[in-house]
């Protein structure tokens, strides 16, 4: 159903013949609504409650039908607070699922779960809307070609490459550079692939969402002077929202991303932070609807809900949605049903390490813990695979030797091990790289490094050709030529000091 969000508001369609019901029961965010016989709304239809509360304040609450109870009653979950609602209030069945604005007009804007802008920049300039509940693409529409999604970030492209149209889990605590990595990916995808990004804040801290918005404006990902030039649309359903909103905000973001893929035929990057909160909200709604809890108190429909969301994130013959999802692991237990269900859908994992961040190596991606199903010789080619394996072996050997170095010192190592350590330290530093979005903080210009350049650089380090260069020459540079140039500059500086 095509509706006009500028006149009727996103998420609400105007029907000539209104189907009216009345509230019969309110339990927190859950409403029971009675409709006339034969006029029952469908599951997932949006219902709207309009009116005034006891002190005359205007009420406008949108709900989503979840269950048909019999006796002409339905049970719906509210997408905003139900304060002020009373039994007997009139409810309008919109006759369609929640619909949100889609297309280029959404870029640079912040939306809530209903697709309403919340950034005080006025209404969204589009008449095109799309329902948030859709089927996953049909089997014949899928693009099964295995191709690497080049990010321009050396450590990711070499050791844990992303799949075009794949799903990536981003594991990291606070302060290790997760936000900066997300912003750099948004920036690089826009430049290298002409792509756009959609960020879905699911059950986030409001402060973090605000920080991300401010940093995006500062780094130019969102262009304040010309909003149309922005590269990202933001959709937020924060921690303080009712569970219905937190459960559906991921679908709102996904719907906006699907339009860019299917209609604009673009490569889209979809960020979901945090996928665990999506599961958590589903668990709350499940309990409110009276379903029997399953393992560890989660909803019995956990796998279905996760699958419904994840199966829509895929590559078609038109374009692709590549999804990067932050994954919170409750009590660091990877066997918990929420992360365990998420793992089944992931193609790659990018693990951020506090140890590397403490050393000042950014991006602080752990080269040994991060994994990818794409790192196979038949997909990435023999040269890439061999280089990646040798880099990992060198770093692993360095890790094993660190205890010996700490106790006895470098001098006690064999000649071969000393060489391995020297190369590993160069590799560790060469895995760092200056980011475009961090230019304002570091003062050094950002670098996008192509995959071929990345492989060439690491092959040169492993071959021993660069053993004579100081390790600081490899820190925060782009390709290997910049490292050799930096080494020459360092040598000249030291001569001048003498």
Curated annotation (Swiss-Prot):
Keywords: ATP synthesis, ATP-binding, CF(1), Chloroplast, Hydrogen ion transport, Ion transport, Membrane, Nucleotide-binding, Plastid, Thylakoid, Translocase, Transport. It is found in: Plastid, Chloroplast thylakoid membrane. GO terms for biological process: proton motive force-driven mitochondrial ATP synthesis. The keyword Signal does not apply. One of its GO terms (molecular function) is ATP binding. ATP binds at residues 172-179. It is a peripheral membrane protein. GO terms for cellular component: chloroplast thylakoid membrane; mitochondrion; proton-transporting ATP synthase complex. PANTHER family: ATP SYNTHASE, ATP SYNTHASE SUBUNIT BETA, MITOCHONDRIAL. This is ATP synthase subunit beta, chloroplastic. It comes from Eucalyptus globulus subsp. globulus. The lineage of its organism: Eukaryota, Viridiplantae, Streptophyta, Embryophyta, Tracheophyta.
């Amino acid at each position: 159903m095509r509706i006009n969000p500028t006149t009727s508001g996103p998420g609400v369609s105007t029907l000539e013949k209104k189907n009216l019901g009345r509230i019969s029961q309110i339990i927190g965010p859950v409403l029971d609504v009675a409709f006339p016989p034969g006029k029952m709304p469908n599951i997932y239809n949006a219902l709207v409650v309009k009116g005034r509360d006891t002190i005359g304040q205007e009420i406008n609450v949108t709900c989503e039908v979840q269950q048909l109870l019999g006796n002409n009653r339905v049970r719906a979950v509210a997408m905003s607070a139900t304060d002020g609602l009373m039994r007997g209030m009139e409810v309008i069945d919109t006759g369609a699922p929640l619909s949100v604005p889609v297309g280029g007009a959404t870029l640079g804007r912040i939306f809530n779960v209903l697709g309403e802008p919340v950034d005080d920049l006025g209404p969204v300039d589009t008449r095109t809307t799309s329902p948030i509940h859709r089927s996953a693409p049909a089997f014949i529409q899928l693009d099964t070609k295995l191709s690497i999604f080049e990010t321009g970030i050396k450590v990711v492209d070499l050791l844990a490459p992303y799949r075009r149209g794949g799903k990536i889990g981003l594991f990291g605590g606070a302060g290790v550079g997760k936000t900066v990595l997300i912003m750099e990916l948004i920036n690089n995808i826009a430049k290298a692939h002409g792509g756009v990004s959609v960020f879905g804040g699911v059950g986030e801290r409001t402060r973090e969402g605000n920080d991300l918005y401010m940093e995006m404006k500062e780094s130019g990902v969102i262009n304040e002077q010309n909003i149309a030039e922005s590269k990202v649309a933001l959709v937020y359903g924060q921690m303080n929202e009712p569970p219905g909103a937190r459960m559906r905000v991921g679908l709102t973001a996904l719907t906006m991303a699907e339009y860019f893929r299917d209609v604009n035929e673009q490569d889209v990057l979809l960020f979901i932070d945090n996928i665990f909160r999506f599961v958590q909200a589903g668990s709350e709604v499940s309990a409110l609807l009276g379903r029997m809890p399953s393992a560890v108190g989660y909803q019995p429909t956990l796998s279905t809900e996760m699958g419904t969301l994840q199966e829509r994130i895929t590559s078609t013959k038109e374009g692709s949605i590549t999804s990067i999802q932050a994954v919170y692991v409750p009590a660091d237990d990877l066997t918990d049903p929420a992360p365990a269900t998420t793992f089944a859908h992931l193609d790659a994992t990018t693990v951020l390490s506090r140890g590397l961040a403490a050393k000042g190596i950014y991006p602080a991606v752990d080269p040994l813990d991060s994994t990818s199903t794409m790192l196979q010789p038949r997909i990435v080619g023999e040269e890439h695979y061999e280089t990646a394996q040798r880099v990992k072996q060198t770093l692993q050997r360095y890790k094993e030797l660190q205890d010996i170095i700490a106790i006895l010192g470098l001098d006690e190592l064999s000649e071969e091990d000393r060489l391995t350590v020297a190369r590993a330290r160069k590799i560790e530093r060469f895995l760092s790289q200056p980011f475009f979005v961090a230019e304002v903080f570091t003062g050094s210009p950002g670098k996008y490094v192509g995959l071929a350049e990345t492989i060439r650089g690491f092959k040169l380090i492993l071959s021993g050709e660069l053993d004579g260069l100081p390790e600081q020459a490899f820190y925060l540079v782009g390709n290997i030529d910049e490292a050799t140039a930096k080494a020459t500059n360092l040598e000249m500086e030291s001569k001048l000091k003498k």
